[in-house]
């Protein structure tokens, strides 16, 4: 079934298995309750080219705990059983997909309730076969678009499925105090060519940034800031008597990011 989403979109990112698989399920439930429209579930990888230090540390913790691509996909199935209903996008690098087998990957993802796939190290120009395979299984391949040439932006935006993930600046993920001055022009150019909602990520970490972007995009992806919060709460999240309170604190933080998005878009 096609991924159908409507702005404004609050799209949080967490890493599967950080700090433990059962905690990831609780965090996903908390994010949905806090207003998430889509969940990006990151699959830990040993050589994450697009990820900054915060997400690299989270990936290392999850890998140390035994998380793999098949286990991450199965974790989505567990989330569905526990009541997570929002769309879930599987964020994975290409090599684990290749090792599992492309068709097996899509079949397992569909079987466990995934709604789409994002592969950050797969160039758009080489994504055609995987995009077609995803269409066969009803799982759109979400495109990343960075501030590059207008011709390339047009090609990527016009072929986008589900929603379009705009990278706010070149480089790796991570919390940023400020966003590039040219971001607005870039997002306007993307929206000119896109038939699907346009979300922006890489560095979005504060309500003020969310409010700033309301006129030029349809949603925001927040990753490093939330993963950093998980890192801070990890000892309590792994302590049975403290987990409920820690999850509630995480949810409150997520809500503080989602609420300004709703307010900003309601005033458009």
From Swiss-Prot:
<keyword id="KW-0822">Tryptophan biosynthesis</keyword>
<comment type="subunit">
    <text>Tetramer of two alpha and two beta chains.</text>
</comment>
<dbReference type="GO" id="GO:0004834">
    <property type="term" value="F:tryptophan synthase activity"/>
</dbReference>
<feature type="active site" description="Proton acceptor">
    <location>
        <position position="40"/>
    </location>
</feature>
<dbReference type="InterPro" id="IPR011060">
    <property type="entry name" value="RibuloseP-bd_barrel"/>
</dbReference>
<dbReference type="Pfam" id="PF00290">
    <property type="entry name" value="Trp_syntA"/>
</dbReference>
<comment type="similarity">
    <text>Belongs to the TrpA family.</text>
</comment>
<keyword id="KW-0456">Lyase</keyword>
<dbReference type="InterPro" id="IPR018204">
    <property type="entry name" value="Trp_synthase_alpha_AS"/>
</dbReference>
<keyword id="KW-0028">Amino-acid biosynthesis</keyword>
<dbReference type="InterPro" id="IPR002028">
    <property type="entry name" value="Trp_synthase_suA"/>
</dbReference>
<feature type="active site" description="Proton acceptor">
    <location>
        <position position="51"/>
    </location>
</feature>
<comment type="pathway">
    <text>Amino-acid biosynthesis; L-tryptophan biosynthesis; L-tryptophan from chorismate: step 5/5.</text>
</comment>
<dbReference type="GO" id="GO:0005829">
    <property type="term" value="C:cytosol"/>
</dbReference>
<keyword id="KW-0057">Aromatic amino acid biosynthesis</keyword>
<protein>
    <recommendedName>
        <fullName>Tryptophan synthase alpha chain</fullName>
        <ecNumber>4.2.1.20</ecNumber>
    </recommendedName>
</protein>
<comment type="function">
    <text>The alpha subunit is responsible for the aldol cleavage of indoleglycerol phosphate to indole and glyceraldehyde 3-phosphate.</text>
</comment>
<dbReference type="InterPro" id="IPR013785">
    <property type="entry name" value="Aldolase_TIM"/>
</dbReference>
